[in-house]
């Protein structure tokens, strides 16, 4: 425990009372007198006195401005009256006083004495004898200096700016003249200075008071506090020496964006103690708990399926929050805004401030959540979609979008269907829908399937006409002769377009009996050729043709093709 110094600030100690000090201090005094040329018993100066010694002298004269003191040297010393200011009223001729020997003689041969330096010396000796680092002393703040304040604790001590207070300081001048207790932080013997702190005592007092208050606080009680800080997540209140946090979620039952919407600095609030952590010294406060909780009977008041009206108070990418009564908000998710449109942004349907009617979908009381639906207030066109668009129905629709895998068409506002790329042509291999369709055009198609649950409709264009491959064996029986136009030449053969757009392949081995280096030596794209059907594969939509077979069986056209080829050679 730091010792409490029995010291009165600002008083210039009567050095003559040194004999009343405790025994150990007397011994210390005797040592000092020996150092300064005094005898330990008589306390009289020795024959050899040096500057810096403290001497005992007698007042021989007093004037308005000066005091003349005889210390037993060859001349008397003249000391300014200002150095006796604290004891001038009791100062009389013949009184004994302690003085500091500045010089044994000046330029005029006179002794130079100082009462003030003697007083400071005795004060320093007293500090060394009675105080240590950690001691508590009382003092008065006398003036402002660079970096802090000066405190009179019987001698001047330095109070750094960081040690003045435990709160933010606006003006150092406000502290000048105050009488306070201070803790000695450092005593520098070599430099004869003392550093003190007021902040450490205030902080210790605060911690002690906080611990005491923590023990007194009970959960559920009401207390008044002053708003000392406002943050994004809540408000800190001073509860008469202890800080408590009023979280933004405990300020009101309704939604607020920032605590400053409800409170301001230095405002007094009555709050309820929600929780106390004595180990960490934390107190959680509540303001909304003083009012009725509108969520208590929420399930009875707003059962699922009930229609309610409310105001849009907030829009987020995933939905809109609607206030259905003060303190009660629900969410309309984007998926619950339209039966037929894929809503990406709530602004497509509603705006902040709109009054809307919604349907309660579900309630999560413990989490304070209500799910609402906007589309549920309107008829769902998918309810009777199967009756409206039966399979096999022919429809005309506008092409809304083309993708790599198909074309989307709008059957009615909000109801779209897909024509898959595989349902566009019986015979043509379509690489992209843009080969057949253009966005914005209308197209006739057949309903192929309706999935009510997944909200999907598929359509087909090729289904408008019979599948020619179903009649392929009748149209092109094996062994029959056909004619067509060469549309494509590959390394393995030539493709020929036949009747109804069906393609047949003349393999390279079936082109000619005569040897040739490459197919282009025999055929070119655009050539009209005759060939014989040698094989059909309806499942894989393949027709195999042969010019060789056609020629072997005496087909004139086949000969003409070879002759044309010979002419090119």
From Swiss-Prot:
It comes from the Bacteria. Keywords: Repeat, Ribonucleoprotein, Ribosomal protein, RNA-binding. GO terms for biological process: translation. The keyword Transmembrane does not apply. Disulfide bonds: none annotated. GO terms for molecular function: mRNA binding; structural constituent of ribosome. Residues 52-116, 134-199, 220-288, 305-375, 392-462, 479-548 form the S1 motif domain. PROSITE patterns: S1 (PS50126). GO terms for cellular component: cytosolic small ribosomal subunit. The keyword Magnesium does not apply. SMART domains: S1 (SM00316). Belongs to the bacterial ribosomal protein bS1 family. Binds mRNA; thus facilitating recognition of the initiation point. It is needed to translate mRNA with a short Shine-Dalgarno (SD) purine-rich sequence. This is Small ribosomal subunit protein bS1.
